[in-house]
Regions:
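Amphipathic alpha-helical packing segments from all-alpha helical-bundle domains
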Residues: 67, 99, 103, 112-150
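Hydrophobic alpha-helical connector segments
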Residues: 57, 69-97, 149
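Helix-turn-helix
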Residues: 10, 18-53, 57
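N-terminal intrinsically disordered/low-complexity leader segments
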Residues: 1-6, 186-192
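Residue-level preference for short helical/loop micro-motifs built around acidic side chains
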Residues: 25-26, 52-53, 82, 103, ...
Length: 192
């Protein structure tokens, strides 16, 4: 059975290939339309607002794929600390191994940094919350879980952009040492 690819996904796939080939700054709508095998007018019908709307859709899709992969990678999570270590380890390893992200940071640093900070952070936090918050319901109430996920995502991005001399989030022992006091702040204190 052949999988049916929506026209939108076909355009997003083409956009990804074009970005990988030429980088973001030199890319035109015509390049993407040609790669997707559609007209420029069709691309604008699929993504009213053009390039910006299309790249927003691509970023959201890639974030969803990233967090879906993260969710699928979790194994035997017995505690909030274990969850934090596994999530951070997955995220750091994926970001370090992302050739496209590395290329963007090397050649189009301003664009890449904006997508991880000023412009992109609210989107990253929203998608992280959608995917990760439900996974920690057994450890925290919903309001705490939402705050925890936001702080965890901010920490991981910070450690990726400015690696620490003291902690490596890809190393489970190092990540455990970092996250133990962080997680303790969210755990109920035993009274008595």
């Amino acid at each position: 059975m052949v999988a049916v690819v929506s026209p939108e996904d076909r355009v997003l796939d083409a956009a990804r290939r074009c970005v990988d080939r030429w980088g973001l700054s030199k890319l035109t709508i015509d390049d993407i339309a040609t790669e997707a095998g559609i007209s420029r007018a069709t691309l604008y019908r699929l993504f009213p607002g053009g390039k910006d709307v299309m790249f927003d859709a691509l970023r959201v899709r890639e974030l969803q794929e990233f967090f879906s992969g993260m969710r699928d990678s979790l194994h035997h999570v017995d505690s909030l600390l274990d969850f934090s270590v596994q999530v951070a380890g997955y995220a750091i390893r994926e970001m370090r191994n992302d050739e496209h992200l590395a290329m963007m940071l090397a050649t189009e640093e301003g664009t890449a940094l904006k997508s991880l900070t000023v412009e992109g952070l609210p989107r990253i936090l929203r998608v992280a919350s959608e995917y990760i918050t439900p996974l920690i319901g057994e450890f925290l109430d919903p309001d705490q879980a939402e705050v925890f996920v936001e702080l965890l995502a901010r920490l991981v991005i910070s450690y990726f952009l400015a690696p620490s001399e003291h902690f490596d989030l890809a190393d489970s022992e190092s990540a455990t040492a970092l996250f133990r006091p962080f997680v303790a702040a969210f755990q109920p204190v035993a009274v008595g």
